[in-house]
Amino acid sequence: MRKYVFDAKKTKDEIVEWIRNYFRVNGPGCNAIIGISGGKDSTVVAALCCEALGKDRVIGVLMPQGVQDDIDVAREVVKYLDIQSFEINIGETVNKLLQAGRTGGIVDSHQARVNLPARIRMATLFMVSQSMNGRVSNNCNASESYIGWATIGGDAFGQFSPLGKLTVTEVKKIGFELGLPEKFIKKAPSDGLTGKTDEDNFGFTYEFLDHYIRTGDFDNDVETAAKIDKMHDANTFKEMPMPTFNPNCCEWGW
């Protein structure tokens, strides 16, 4: 079993400085554009950006799909953080794009329907970003990424990723270190697409997954460890940079 120690305060301070450095180099004076779902990841990212940049440079974007019961939590988050926010309902856009595809002869798959809202949300974030002098955050965590629980072109995208190398367990600890209310940190993670919690979809808990990722220990639960390994192996392509052909005729300086 691998040795594992996590210092939440030290890590929080390092992320704050990392965000400052990112904007210093890649967007002096730019705003952080954050899709706010009401879950712990987007809430923690927003709070970190507030500490790093000041709340006046943090903009939350709420993107419910039609009537969405938990959107009130996202509204509470932006009110608690006292940040500027916009609410843009993507329901009509999703439906119209699906209908346009069907009119054009596309028989849309279940996976296409499930992942389309995430992709529309990311397009929406970049629309807001280019209108508000921003840089779009990626709110994924290491637990999700390890098993491919993210949508290419959707929540897996963005321009800077404060939590991408932190597990769900670690993100929660960062949230408490930031002094965020427990209701924001302990809200059951869901995919935001099917109405199920992440753990319902997985068939195992984040606690088990995070412990396995960090230590390699699976407490003799061979079946669950094998399931995690299979999900990881099947989704590593999501973490790879886009393969690009490089011609031999010339040397590129970048």
Task: Label each residue range with its predicted role.
Residues 119-123:
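Catalytic-core regions of hydrolytic enzymes
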Residues 1-34, 48, 56-59, 66, ...:
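ATP/NTP-dependent adenylation/nucleotidyl-transfer catalytic domains that generate, transfer
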Residues 51:
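Primarily recognizes the serine-hydrolase "nucleophile elbow" in alpha/beta-hydrolase
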